[in-house]
Design a protein with these regions (language model features):
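Conserved aromatic anchor
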Residues: 603-626
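Acidic, low-complexity/disordered segments
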Residues: 521-601
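Ser/Thr/Gly-rich low-complexity blocks that favor extended beta-strand/coil architectures
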Residues: 139, 149-152, 303-332, 516-551
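Surface-exposed, non-catalytic interaction/assembly patches
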Residues: 77-126, 135, 186-191, 371-377, ...
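Small/polar beta-strand repeat architecture
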Residues: 280-367, 550-578
């Protein structure tokens, strides 16, 4: 069937002579066929816009409406959609803003976010209580896990007795927070914030705990996703299911009817996303707590919920863990995890009941991880076109509108079609183009957000010294944005595939009889022809267009299954946080002694005598505190005010 592509496969290369450039690691692909005005508008692009973006000629020539053109739309550079979405996320996703018009993000998978303050009020006899309401995301979300004040857990001992957090998941039936109604009269029962996931944070003034208004962030498990495989809706970060959710949601997505989706393709894509990839052998030691079923580590780990792990020990493992079993991680905090017996249980939060801490030193080793996940925020201020392309980067996806339905196909190793092009169905002349160095890479740098580094932007770089030598030592680099990838291994894998695919840039353009409509964009087909000397050489279809003479125009790119072989990656490097002391954490003065007697009296020149109290304390062991100042305050008995 025919269609319009509004994106591109990772690393696709089509010569400028072909009329469509798919280059420099454009990552998302949306393909539409059977184009009508309604089908085009559903993604926020008119036919005229799609024609311009795709660089496709004769898009609607000849009045073809029910079966139009398939075309790869890309850019001569990194995807502008990726860059726009990534830039929007980088600007303030971990900050707090204050506005009544800010767009509310949609969270897929797990993400740490800031939010928009919609209320700041004080209460108490001396205004000692501060009340803050921060909207985090479009609701409902699966869970709001940890809340942080200036990157410190709200449950930290530093905030004991000073911080109260109420979490609201943002259901449609959400009620106004009763505690906030009691504390702040202007917050009434009508202030429900329905469909908004938010936190209400109450702070009690303490100059030692707070140096100013803290930045409030939270770890959020985002949207629950419908899975057409079993008809269930549950929390998941499966990239294919996230794309499906965005397409069908009428509030923040495109509101496409489920009847217009080819769920067989979405099920296949979701299964491909869940495929397990053997991970580098990252390991670290842990202690187990039977009371909380938790494994605790000394540092943040590059391990996410759903990752497969194994455990070992020098003595006795915590009961009932065994060394031969693959468990699945449930991430509680950056340094604390629980274990589940399956990936499904991990996402459902069903943890293994640990009944003993074991004996000796225990080690956790990462075993595997899902091929593609979607962990990030959708900026609802961006166009649906840009957001869909950005979502597709998480799974190297192609969204195709064909036969009246949208289908999702991943750019993965694909079995060749039984149908092929030969001299019997290829007509007329054709063009063969080889991509130049502008779209060939020997280095790819992928930008992503790293949970192991408090969700700060990070880079994963893949480089081939062999290819660089082939390229006369020139650095041929592509920079790509992966706004919905939150794992260094996945970012490296996508970067490696981008690099590999760029080296197979041979593109063929030809006309064929209508028999060519037996294949679709995304299919891998063999081409046999004596002119170039090809015998069942494999190509992936990038474009199909019906011509005025009832022939079809085909553009295909060289296909090689070897590019999908997973590279051997090094274990992620864990960078320890600074061990400098917290400048806002002041050690408690100990060993306080008070003495008042004849030795402490002060006799003035006029003969008068002033009574004094000598104060003593144990010198602090902290060298930073030793070089600081200690302030002594006193008050008269039965009075409340202290003075220096």
């Amino acid at each position: 069937m025919a269609g319009i592509v509004i994106g591109a496969i990772v690393g696709s290369v089509v010569s400028e002579a072909v009329g469509a450039v798919v280059a420099d690691a454009v990552l998302g692909m949306v393909i539409e066929s059977g184009i009508t005005a309604a089908a085009a508008d559903v993604l926020g692009a008119s036919l005229a816009t799609a024609s311009f973006i795709g660089g496709a000629t004769g898009l609607v020539a000849g009045g073809v409406a029910s079966l139009a053109v398939q075309s790869v739309i890309g850019s001569n550079g990194p995807s502008s959609a990726q860059s726009a979405v990534a830039a929007a996320q980088a600007q303030g996703i971990l900050l707090n803003s204050q506005s009544n018009v800010d767009p509310i993000p949609v969270i897929y998978g797990r993400r740490r976010v800031g939010g928009t303050r919609v209320l700041i009020e004080v209460s108490g006899a001396s205004n000692e209580y501060l009340h803050i309401v921060v909207v985090l995301a479009e609701g409902p979300v699966a869970a709001i896990d940890n809340v942080y004040l200036d990157d410190l857990l709200a449950t930290d001992a530093k905030f004991a007795g000073l911080v109260t957090v109420n979490k609201h998941l943002g259901t449609a039936s959400e009620s106004a927070d009763s505690d906030l109604i009691s504390a702040v009269p202007k917050w009434t029962t009508e202030c429900k914030l329905a469909n908004c996931a938010y936190v209400y944070v109450k702070l009690k003034y303490d100059s030692n705990a707070f140096s100013g208004l803290p930045t409030i962030t939270a770890d959020v498990r985002g949207r629950t996703l419908y899975d057409p495989c079993d008809g269930q809706t549950r929390y998941s970060n499966n990239a294919a299911l996230a794309v499906r959710d965005y397409l069908t949601n009428p509030l923040y997505g495109r509101g496409i009817s489920a009847a217009n989706l080819d769920d067989v393709s979405f099920i296949a894509a979701a299964s491909a996303c869940d495929a397990r990839i053997t991970s580098p052998a990252f390991s670290d030691t842990f202690t187990a707590d039977a009371a909380s079923d938790t494994l605790t580590f000394a540092q943040a780990l590059p391990i996410d919920t759903g990752d497969g792990i194994k455990v070992s020990t020098v003595a006795t493992l915590p009961t009932p863990l065994t060394a031969t079993t693959t468990y699945y991680a449930i991430k509680s905090t950056d340094t604390a995890y629980q274990l589940a017996t399956s990936a499904a249980n991990a996402f459902a939060g069903i943890a293994v009941d640990i009944t003993s801490a074991g004996v000796g030193t225990h080690t956790l080793t990462q075993a595997d991880y899902a091929a593609y996940t979607c962990d990030g925020t959708v900026d609802t201020n961006q166009t649906a076109y840009d957001n869909i392309r950005a979502l597709l980067t998480a799974c190297r996806g192609m969204l195709i509108f064909s036969g009246g339905k949208y289908r999702l196909v991943l750019d993965i190793a694909t079995t060749a079609s039984s149908f092929g092009f030969t001299e019997s169905n290829i007509t007329g002349s054709w063009v063969i183009s080889q991509a130049g160095k502008r779209v060939k890479y020997n280095r790819v740098t992928a930008g992503f957000y790293n949970p192991a580094k408090k969700w700060q932007p990070d880079l994963a770089m893949i480089e081939s010294t062999l290819l660089r030598a082939t390229d006369n030592a020139l650095i041929l680099e592509a920079k790509i944005d992966l706004p919905f990838t939150a794992n260094s291994y996945r970012a490296q894998n996508i970067g490696q595939l981008t690099l590999n695919q760029s080296r197979y840039g041979l593109v063929v353009k030809f006309s064929a009889f209508q028999e060519g409509l037996r294949c679709e964009v995304g299919d891998v087909v063999p081409i046999t022809h004596s002119t170039p000397g090809w015998s069942a050489k494999l190509f992936r279809i990038l474009q199909i267009e019906i011509k005025d003479n009832d022939e079809v125009y085909v553009v295909a790119r060289e296909y090689n299954a070897s590019i999908y072989t997973q590279a051997v990656l090094a274990p992620a490097a864990v960078i320890a946080e600074s061990n400098l002391p917290d400048p806002f954490s002041v050690p408690t003065v100990t060993g306080l002694t008070l003495a008042s007697g004849t030795a402490e009296l002060l006799r003035l020149a006029d003969g008068s005598v002033i009574s004094r109290i000598r104060v003593g304390w144990t010198a602090p062991s902290d060298i930073y505190a030793q070089k600081g100042q200690i302030e002594v305050q006193s008050r008269i008995a039965n009075e409340s005010a202290w003075s220096p």
